[in-house]
Amino acid sequence: MLKKVAALALTLIFVLLTTMANTTNQTADRQFEKLAKDYIEKLLETSPEWATILGDHRFDNRLSDYSLAGVQKRRAFNEEFLNKLKAIDLARLSKANNIDARIMRDNLEYNL
């Protein structure tokens, strides 16, 4: 009887810990997915030619700003999103999101 109770307790602890880990991983995935969505939206807004090439015509009436102020604004944008990305534990992301996060990180670092 004691062995059955101990086995049941261990099983419940395992299930609880697995659930907690999955919840943490899902939270990291949701956090990254929101960041990625915000990044893409801002990227299309600040690079209207790319938006048009990709079929998003909301910014067709604009051109990219290549002035010093525009370059500084894009640099600040890249730094902001890189810092937000660094705050996410990539090890907790799903495989697909982990790959996307690494691609995003490489792109942000390249643009700095």
Describe the residue ranges of each PLM region.
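Bacterial N-terminal signal peptides
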Residues: 8-17
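Bacterial N-terminal signal peptides that target proteins for export
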Residues: 1-9
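N-terminal maturation segment of proteins
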Residues: 17-112
